[in-house]
Structure formats: C-alpha cells, structure tokens
C-alpha cells in the first residue's frame, strides 16, 4: 500500500486522469484507484478533491439517475481541467525522472 503522505501531492492529478476519460462518480473513482494499486482511498478523501476541482473550474458535475439507489453526482474534466492535467503529467514525469536518477545512483553506490 502506498503511504498516504506520498499520495497527497498526486491524488488530485490521478483523479483528474480518471475523470478525463469519461464522467465518473466518487465511489467509482475510489474503485478505479484501488484497481490501479492505490489501496482503499476513503471517499472522504476523494470528495473534497472533487469539490475543489469543481470550484476551480477544472471539473463539471451533474446528477444522473442510478439504476440502484439515489442519483449520483458525475464529474467530468473541463477544457481548463485538461490543461491542468497536461501540466500535472509533465511535472509528475519530471519529478519521477529526478527521483529515478537519484535512486539509480544510490543503488550503484550501495553495491
């Protein structure tokens, strides 16, 4: 399981990536994250991030009927959100590249 402190800076970008594919509701986002290996992310963590995305104009939300139970709030990325996602991906790749280089160097020193 990935430590929550490590997830803090990346979870919002991962949620944007999920809702960029198709409109999705909170529980389904949590399930997709779990399927990708993020472990069980509490909906209480996901919903504040979704609301922030919506407040900042990065996502739109609409209620849709559910086959079971009450209506669900589906989130979709806006054009501004897609730009932010592209920026996140570029920054994330830069960060992971730097971390990989450092870890590779450390690995070479320990042998």
Place the predicted regions along the sequence by residue.
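Basic, amphipathic "hinge/linker" alpha-helix immediately C-terminal to the N-terminal HTH DNA-binding motif
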Residues: 71-89
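Beta-hairpin "wing" of winged helix-turn-helix
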Residues: 56-71, 76
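Short beta-strand/turn micro-motifs at beta-sheet edges
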Residues: 1-5, 62-64
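Amphipathic alpha-helical dimerization/coiled-coil segments
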Residues: 83-111
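Short, hydrophobic-biased segments on the C-terminal half of alpha helices
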Residues: 47-54
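Short, charged/polar surface micro-motifs in flexible loops or helix N-caps
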Residues: 21-25, 55-56, 81
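Short, well-ordered turn and helix-capping elements at secondary-structure junctions
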Residues: 33, 37, 63-65, 79
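N-terminal helix-turn-helix DNA-binding core of bacterial DNA-binding proteins
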Residues: 3-47
């Amino acid at each position: 399981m990935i430590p929550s402190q490590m997830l803090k800076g990346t979870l919002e970008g991962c949620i944007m990536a999920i809702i960029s594919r198709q409109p999705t509701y909170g529980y389904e986002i949590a399930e997709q994250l779990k399927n990708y290996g993020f472990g069980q992310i509490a909906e209480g963590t996901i919903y504040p991030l979704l609301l922030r995305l919506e407040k900042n104009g990065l996502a739109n939300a609409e209620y849709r009927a559910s086959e079971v139970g009450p209506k669900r709030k589906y989130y979709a990325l806006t054009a501004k959100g897609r730009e932010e996602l592209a920026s996140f991906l570029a920054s994330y790749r830069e960060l992971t590249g730097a971390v990989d280089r450092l870890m590779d160097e450390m690995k070479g020193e320990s042998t």
